Amino acid sequence: MTFNPSKKLYISDVTLRDGSHAIRHQYTLDDVRAIARALDKAKVDSIEVAHGDGLQGSSFNYGFGRHTDLEYIEAVAGEISHAQIATLLLPGIGSVHDLKNAYQAGARVVRVATHCTEADVSKQHIEYARNLGMDTVGFLMMSHMIPAEKLAEQGKLMESYGATCIYMADSGGAMSMNDIRDRMRAFKAVLKPETQVGMHAHHNLSLGVANSIVAVEEGCDRVDASLAGMGAGAGNAPLEVFIAVAERLGWNHGTDLYTLMDAADDIVRPLQDRPVRVDRETLGLGYAGVYSSFLRHAEIAAAKYNLKTLDILVELGHRRMVGGQEDMIVDVALDLLAAHKENRA
């Protein structure tokens, strides 16, 4: 495949969805309006809006949001004129009923997300989204956990259901550039030429931007990123950094770098109650290949049981826990506590 640097990249911002994890889903409506205005001014292509765990993610298991998904979507819809509103749906958390409501509130793009081995559970939701006329994306989470060829098979399933774009989501921020190359090439080998591919990076190994750049060089059409990297774990690929690199490379991204830089520092970074950065705990996520949104839950469990967050995260990695198993974090903490007591006996 010949890389075409003049091809228009689709810039997908996830500050108002993945970024919600970084502040335990506590954005105010004024926050989302201000962020949406800045992103729309900068001319990103889509703005993803939802609880961090997607439509109807607000729950005891994942953490309650300050507002409902529909309140957030409606708030953003009133502020934008260029970008499309995207949303995320995990089958089993959100339903087709929730998707219909999100569409009526203004969402026009949906990413139907499953664990990387469970594409088959997305069929109903992808078909329903296509029937609504939505831009319908298949989103394979924790993509580091299976070989490239197996991941491509799962993407092919989502394509067969009607998805017109397939995303590789490095939810654990655990992949290297070669991992990205292998998976992008595997996608391209089996998907239809007209099916787009996307990259969703996390920055736990400080490779979020590098991995996104490599993905584009391998033919990726859509790139996820967030202002100031606002997202689970060490965050996503920082949008303003990715755009700065793309600008230096002469790529056609269509966004305004300085507007993004101002929004990152003046609007988003002040909202962080815990710095979104690579540190001992978030590096542990990437090193152990752990779902990035486990971070804040593990920190709470560590404080409650007087354990180290890193120990909990590494054990979660050993057990190959995946998104949706947040309830197991306390179980792991209790097992570690019992082991510590036994060692002291």
Curated annotation (Swiss-Prot):
PANTHER family from the UniProt entry: 2-ISOPROPYLMALATE SYNTHASE 1, CHLOROPLASTIC-RELATED, HOMOCITRATE SYNTHASE-RELATED
Subunit structure, as described in the record: Heterotetramer composed of two DmpG (aldolase) and two DmpF (dehydrogenase) subunits, which allows a direct channeling of acetaldehyde between the two active sites.
SUPFAM superfamilies per UniProt: Aldolase, post-HMGL domain-like
GO terms, biological process: benzoate catabolic process via hydroxylation; L-leucine biosynthetic process; phenol-containing compound catabolic process
Residue ranges of domain Pyruvate carboxyltransferase in the record: 9-261
Enzyme class: lyase
Binding of substrate, residues: R17, D18, S171, H200, Y291
Activation and inhibition: Six- to eight-fold activated by Mn(2+). Retains residual activity after EDTA treatment in vitro. Also activated by NADH and, to a lesser extent, by NAD(+). Strongly inhibited by Zn(2+). Mg(2+) and Ca(2+) have no effect on enzymatic activity.
A UniProt-annotated Pfam family: DmpG_comm
Protein's name according to its UniProt entry: 4-hydroxy-2-oxovalerate aldolase
Family label: Belongs to the 4-hydroxy-2-oxovalerate aldolase family.
